[in-house]
Amino acid sequence: MNNTLFNSNYDKLIEPLYGIKRNIEEDKLLLQDNIVPSTYNICDRVDMTKQSIYSIDPDGCEDADDAFSIYEENDKLWLAIHIADPTEHINIGSSLWKNIEQNVVTRYPSNKKPIHMMPNEIMEKASLMVNQYGDIKLAITILTEIDKETYQPIGKVKLLFTKIKVSKNNALSYMNAGKSIESNTIISNGLKISKSLQNLRSLKTKGVVLNEISISFPKYDNLNNTSHLYLDSVTEISMKQMIAEFAIFANSFIGEYLKINFDGTGLYRICSAKDWLNTVYSEISGQDLLNEIIVNGIKAEYISTVSPHDLVGAPEYTHFTSPIRRLSDCVCHYLLKYIHLKSTIHDLCVPFTNDQLMKYSNDCVRLTKSIKNIQYKDTKFRIIQTINNMLINNENVTIQYYVTSYTGLYLNIIICNINEHCVYLSYTLRISDLQTKYEIKLVKSLDITRVNCIDKFDEGTIPELDNVFITKSV
């Protein structure tokens, strides 16, 4: 089966699941009653335009939510984590905000343009990248002193409303950032800081071993209409882990900040897994922990009252670092602005009621789960397409898989490796065979010589895998 047919089926079966694309004319109407500045705007900002700002993102990224700077001042070393501030361009009483409430998240169909949560104009104004709106951008910044010996945060962490200057030269891909570790002091110091942050988290949770996992993913060659499995280099992985640790540090600080300054209400990201984690053996690998998380149904959720996120090791945790693509983070930003402004504007209204916060948490849980399921289907489709490309190129293909559960009707399988590549691919077969006892979590290998394009069900997509189980039930 050729790629043209796969791509045609993707356009028919997968892309529509993400929903309707943004309409330029409708976005113009949304912007008409978006009057800014509005109630929660911050006019008095700390000027950090003299600092070198770095952003590290995937190739082709337009919606850069986060950046950082590391610098010395008064013989002290500082880490500043800068988060884009789209809410400064959004009136909370506008039709635009209602549209964002409905969208909840940005959707990312593979090898396609994103379906942004907000109109392009707002996205580009907020994005911490040089674009048609210039190189001076607004940010909410987490500032901490760093110990020059241990590279751990010390002293009081500060929350600042800032303006920063971004640079095209410092907008790096993970690959280019990784290549500059040895030559760029800021990048190398950032890596040292992130490793110290990870070591501190390892004292609180076994979840840090998830950082070990490197999942291969399809990489597209649109010029030649093909794809292949790609594994990040060691330096690319280290850059992704660095940015992740900065985000966890910022989200944990903001979670604590909201608990203290907003009476424990807000929009928190939680995962109640402490008791379960205590049952996991101490030397477990990242891949084995991920398998156990899947089998045991461990999941993170949004709630409107404070509670721990045990997988990241934080007693309070929120989503603050991706406001261009997540409603939850925008809500968090408005709450931070309210806390900042209420000391000088005594009659300032709280932006959201408790009922609204509860609704937001429910909407975020529902939409996040829905989009994650769509992304699983998307990834599955593209990996099957990539296996097809490998077979067309006469490559040998061996998969490793294991059974996660059997419900009495559906057999749930995870494909965890394709040749040397670690992947995560769910595969479900309908089998009415209560007599067979399936070995759960036992990894087995299977050579594959053909695949078919995914249709409504998984069965028939990998015939040789089907035959391992379906022939037994005949």
Feature names for model-found ranges:
Residues 1-30:
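Boundary/activation segment at the start of structured domains
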